[in-house]
């Protein structure tokens, strides 16, 4: 087949060269191609950096089907395509073209594609980009032609007029020479028409493709925003044809792929330069939705709640009584004469089908107003009876025939009740009703609703009737007007008047839309055991909701229950393991899943699954996508109701080699464990040392909310209206205050479990001597005296071989602590002592890192690294110095060095644990952030919204709208406070547990397995952390186990013997008794057993009652409204500079310092634990011991000298010691001594 082109050269204004005709054009093949992850674009003008952004806009869904169109010429005669049909624009278009010869030249956008409406042309004529919006006479086959590599004809449109936009871009030269080989160019575009602007996004990729659209990820950037202001419903592509002559043009190879945008949610990842580097289509599959729900591209193993679903109705059930008679409305409306208004007449209509559409569609009625019911809904309703009241009044008096009206007619002739349910119909009958008609002009008392007074006087002979003189020549306001008032009696008895709706079959036990006598709803209908009275049509529950109905045809009573509704949970092994997921439809039968839809009534394809081997019912709901194994194993991912899931291979659970998510029943023991089967247990025979890190939060940040500023901003009108809400705001802050008090109480109670430090008595003045410069100040227990600092600042520890080198490196500079870390047997270690300067430095770094992490985008968290490192190094130091724990357990001692590696591995999780604790701290800020986002997205800027309302509406309507905003904000605040209360309860429970562990694990040695770490407890060390405590538990865990046959008791001579401590085990030939946590067999004696009862086995059944969750009673709002919505006055509040939310930061530096000191003293107080090893710690004598020691020496010397002198045994040491008179050798003691003369003896 060959394509022939004929040119029609029309000499029109603004005409191009004419148009061409294509002969024998085949229909497009329209093959489908996957879009993969292409077509993402920058949908707004906001610059974002290093952030994940959730946005809702019109995007091309990932992996959607694109339609392929060709410009193709194969063998010149047989396969020739030039596909340029008119395509649907929809909500936007994704367009991708693969080519090599510049075949694609542009597009035409419009609606009718004729000269009656404007169209937009965006084309490349090989030298310019031309953009025009006009009324075009478009060519049937718009195209460009290229002859011998040169642009020849522009056959796009013949003429144009009424142009409103005309733009020509800068000139260039397009290569129009046909090329051979593979496709070299991939150009992608996105077109969106919003608010009169056509936005164009584009990206270019160099390719080398023989065919098809490449897979991958692409991001398009904005290039044009054109203010066309036209309606765009369709578009078509403008392409070029080629020839070596001036005729017989043929297409060159090119392909383009199109798809429509859909409104969806995408999560975009921006790098630090503001570039989109990745994206997730949140509705693509369960894993994608999960990523958007947790706002993270990486998902850890577990089960996550994503969204809600509701089972959609499958059928519609309409049940009306079997009534065929037509209601006689024609007799009422077409009566020959209508009565006087004071003597109005009533007609009862029953046992008939009422076609109200004839009435409210009639154009002859001047008034058709309904109260308590919509005219368009009457066709779906049934009533016990309908009453038609008729009378004649003036046209101007029709307004008085309405609830709550006053006037001569409403007060003295015809009165409607305030709760009137019905319709008022009136029409002008000036030509038909003429003459005198009467009405009552006055009366002693006003009429009651539907009261009729036929008297003509007031009882005292005074005439009360006046006359209408109707004729067609008076003004319209005084002309005769007929009025029919239809009063509807609501169903309190069987329906007798229904709309002309055809009844359908009754469908039970399925989710359906139902209509019983006008009662509409959605639910499941089931047979009921209730009994109705003969007149009763509906049944109500304690909350006054309709929960049962009588079928008007069979008179059967039916219960109404809601259709299945619940959450959708996604089970994932973690994105690092697999992208495979399973989906749990909570509390729903699998038979309902194919019709399950999301709460917003959308039906993504992934929601609908076909039944098969990977669909099975559990008590938790319908699980889809996981293979069910009929066995019990240790739980990996708990799903609920005793069902667990794992990501396993064939060697573990399955019969094939492929990994898959496997669901199974939860077991108490490990897989194939003999410890829980066949009367056998596993008893440890060997152990290894392990260290477990445990983080226990005990408090959280305190917050308060400035309710008025947060809800109303600077709007005085809103603030005044907020006063009518009573004590809502006060109660919110009262709850937050209670949370803050609870946090202080938690902290106090946790630290109260720690033993108080030993305090020395206050000794400042003793025996008249002032010791204030020598003895420490008892009011400052952490400060040493000058002499203490000078003489006694060292502690002697057992050196495993690294402490001396550390001390030589450290010198007197505490800041070199980490730098001086030593290597010991391949491990980095530090001495297990911290000076006060070191404690202060590390604590400050930790607190600063945690506090600044929130506003430094995580960079501040780097300050926490030294804290984690020194903690790990010091515990390495503790480990290597404890070279002998048990001399009678040589194997444990020998394996200690290998266990140090495990300790290091365990301590590597400390940073992660602290990160979790940081999450506890930041959850409050996150809740506030969520609250702000919720209010921002739902209500916009507070002040601008309120001011806009006040400017557009009158006072009453404005207060109604502001009231809605206040209600929404109060609800958000209430949600936030509820989250805080829940979190506070969790923190309280954690604080209680931390206090217990402080007592049992730190101050003692717990006998509970896995309570203080994983395994059997040896010792624990607390470390302070923001808003919590970090415990490092040293435990020994079984490294080898052996299975033994066991029995709970031994029956001997009709009596049952039970072990006092431990269990009975058998080695195959004999029975022994051994400890449960370590195999140490002993002979069974009366010392380790006791006798109780006989050998009979008594089986008891515990209470297994399962209580249904309580249904809250929905009481009337009246009491609540009476309590809060009341007249309330208050002086104006000066808000000043009070911020909207006061998210205060609690400074617990003193508590952290205190915890450091307490932890140190606790470690020193574990005297009983020193018996476990050979670790020795020598403390130098205090200064007062040294003083006493020196004083004693001095006293001994003085006493010795005195004795020597008194006993004349002084040797004088050749004159070095002069003893005075005690060394004289004069025998005459009576010789006088001359004053001033010194005597010498020889």
From Swiss-Prot:
Residues 1204-1242 are cytoplasmic. Residues 889-939 are annotated as: Heptad repeat 1. Specific enzymatic cleavages in vivo yield mature proteins. The precursor is processed into S1 and S2 by host cell furin or another cellular protease to yield the mature S1 and S2 proteins. Additionally, a second cleavage leads to the release of a fusion peptide after viral attachment to host cell receptor. The cytoplasmic Cys-rich domain is palmitoylated. Spike glycoprotein is digested within host endosomes. Disulfide bonds join 19-139, 134-163, 282-292, 327-352, 370-423, 382-498, 809-820. Residues 918-962, 1144-1172 form a coiled coil. It is a single-pass type I membrane protein. Bat coronavirus HKU3 is highly similar to SARS-CoV (SARS-like). This is Spike glycoprotein. It comes from Bat coronavirus HKU3.
